[in-house]
Every structure is written in C-alpha cells, then in structure tokens.
UniProtKB/Swiss-Prot annotation:
InterPro entries: PDZ (IPR001478), PDZ_6 (IPR041489), PDZ_sf (IPR036034), Pept_M50_Zn (IPR004387), Peptidase_M50 (IPR008915). Pfam families: PDZ_6 (PF17820), Peptidase_M50 (PF02163). It comes from Treponema pallidum (strain Nichols). It is an enzyme of class 3 (hydrolase). Belongs to the peptidase M50B family. One of its GO terms (molecular function) is metal ion binding. This is Putative zinc metalloprotease TP_0600. The keyword Signal does not apply. The keyword Membrane applies. Zn(2+) binds at H18, H22.
Amino acid sequence: MIKIIIGVVVLGIVVLFHELGHFVAALWCRVEVLSFSVGMGPVLFRKKFGKTEYRLSMLPLGGYCGMKGEQAFQTALDQKLSRIPVEPGSLYAVGPLKRMGIAFAGPLANVLMAVMVLALVSALGSRVHTFGNRISPVYVYDSSDNSPARRVGLQDGDTILRIGDQPIRYFSDIQKIVSQHAQRALPFVIERRGQLMHVTITPDRDAHTGMGRVGIYHYVPLVVAAVDAHGAASRAGLEPEDKILAVAGRRVQHAVQLLALLKEFRKKSVVLTVLRSGKRRYHTIALVRTENGAIDVGIEWKAHTVVIPGTSFFASVRAGIAETLRMCVLTVKGIGMLFRGLQFQQAISGPLRITHVIGDVAQHGFQESFLTGLSQLCEFVALVCVSLFIMNLLPIPILDGGLILFACVELFMQRSIHPRVLYYLQFVGFAFVALIFLCAFWNDVNFLFH
C-alpha cells in the first residue's frame, strides 16, 4: 500500500510540474488563467487571487490549468463559425508564436524537472550494487537460446575486459554499453583461462525493450549477503557470509549454475555443502518452486558496492543536463524502434504500471539506505519526465505537439485554421491517443495480475 501511495504522489508531482509550466507561460503571455488546481476531482479548498482561482482537489493525480478561451473552439463548432471567437485575455487572442510557447512550456517544465533531479543525484553521489565482469552465457543453461553469446562461443567464467575503447570492471558496465548498441558490431576483449581473446559481437535487439542483448548472465560467486527471513534458505539455517560449495555432492561455482542444478531435482529438498568460518557444514534446503517452475531459495548474493562521490554545484548541473540529453536520445530512438520490429503492444506502459514501478523502486531503494532510495527514485522520475517531454511534443492533435503544429501552420499560412478542420484533426488525434491508452491500460492490467 505504501509503495502505491508513493507512486501516486510522485507521478502526481510530475504531472503538476507539467501544468505549472503551462500556467507560468500563460501568465507571461498575458493569457488569463481562470483556474489552477493541485490535484484532480472534487475541490477541497479554493481561493481567488487576481483573476485566477487556486484550488486544492481531492485526488493527488497531478493538476490542471484552465485558461480563458479554451472552450472557444467548441463555441465555434456549435455556432458553425468560420473562425474561433476571440475575447481579450483569451488563449486565441494571442498570436501563434505565444500559443506555441504556452504549449511548449508544459513539456519544457518536465525536462527541466529531469535536469534538476538528475543534478541532485550527481550532487549527492550514490551507491551502486553490481557484480564483477565475469559472465555466464545463457545458452549453457538454456539449449533453446541462440543469442550472440552462443554464436561467438562465449564460455562459462569468461571475463570481459574491454568493449570498444571502454574498460570493463563491472557487469553494469557491460549492460550499459550493450543495451545502447543493438545490431551494431562491438569489439570485445575477453580473458579465458589466462589467455586474451578478441571477438566481435553484434548484440541482438530485444523485441520487447528495443535494447541490445548478447545473452549473458552475471557470474555471481556463491557468497551469501542476506537471506529472506521467510525464505527456504533461512529455514535451512543459512547465514550471511556463508559460501555454498556443492549441491547434493555436486560442486557449484556461481548462482546461475546453482539455480539450474536445483531445478533439475525432483525431490522436495536437497543437501547443500556450505563453508562457514573455515568449516564445512551441511544444510538441507526445501525446494520452493515459483509459478514458472524456477527455484526460489530466498538468498541475496554478495555484490560489489561502487561508491560514486558527489560533485560540485556546476558539475552536477552539467551532469544533469548530459544525462537528460542521453535519456532524450534513447527515448527518441525507442519511438523509432516501434516502426522497426519492436513489439508495440508490449513496449508501452500506462499510469498504473508507472505508479507501481515508481513505488517499487522507492520502497526497495529506501530499504537499503536513504541515499540509495533517493538516487534510484530520482533516476526513474527523470525517465518519466523525459518520456512525457518527448511524447507530448509528438505532432498529434490534442497533445501539446499538435497545438504547436497548428500554430506553425497558422503562422505559415498567415490565417487561422477553420474550426471544422481542427475538429476532424483532433478527432483523429483523440482516436489515436485513445488506442495507445487502451493498449497501455491492457498491459498495466496484465502486469498487475501477473
């Protein structure tokens, strides 16, 4: 319940920031704002200052900015007018350039919010938990896998030292580079049993995410960092710093190998050989299977903790801008991938899933430490802000990008667009957005139930 509340509040703040951008720009352009609400739904409190009524509404789902003249378009349709009626201080009383500015200000507020939260992450520093640069290919434990790792012959225990001109220390380094280079050849330097090897790997494009993948797991040594208090490992008596050596007498070296071996057993329990304080011990662990047949042992493996120090004010602002630009580029590429084989229905998420993920990220991060939770939450919020920035600027009627497009056409033609033409364009835009929303809602429902 807590993570749902966190998700709703954070997503609401992101949407409110968007509306605040429209609000400030409207006042700057001398367009009267009749109402500005924090929250949606029934109004709990209202107070008028000047010409604007400020409201506090019941549902913390963002807010809205009501400008004078927004309904003039409907008036023109009802009265079958050839132009949208104009009154002083209304939206259509200002020129197309100012209307473009008002429409652009909402998405701009979101991208500025992304810069601010990412600058905060850089200023505070962060801790990243990751594993080393040794890998375990998926195909070794899944015969149906035909990933690039199999095609180039990567082996269990290989160590990736370099990709292109980038040195590799951690598995997260591999993920970052590979994910951004789908279907682009990358030179790898690999160490295998003391020998250096040079191979070229072209990551496949994942049909669900659009990101590159080569088909590898991280090679995780079997040293226990923590056990789930209600899990099988805890009931078997395993403790932090234990090292698992064997399963039913068969030697194991890393986590993927362990889980694959446990999955083979049809018994209800199995004996683990464990090294604790230099002495061998034997623990019988129950084999608890998940819905998809995987084994859940309730163990968190010991990882590397990488401490990223905080930066100065100006350095953090530069880092915030650079990371926001990187996110913008990746988001635009992701939209382009929708037309190049990416599974559209699986690639979009709606507010339910976004809310759930925000809350999940925050809850797990804050359980580890305040700094980790804040950093992870800020990074995900920045991603949501960038997504709203890009999506709202798409030239689709009823979105901010559509309003900007109409203003550009009006500026070029030196006359306003006929209300009936606007109506048909907005109807098409509404149908398109509604279709996307239905797909996102369906994906959200499937996500929550599975």
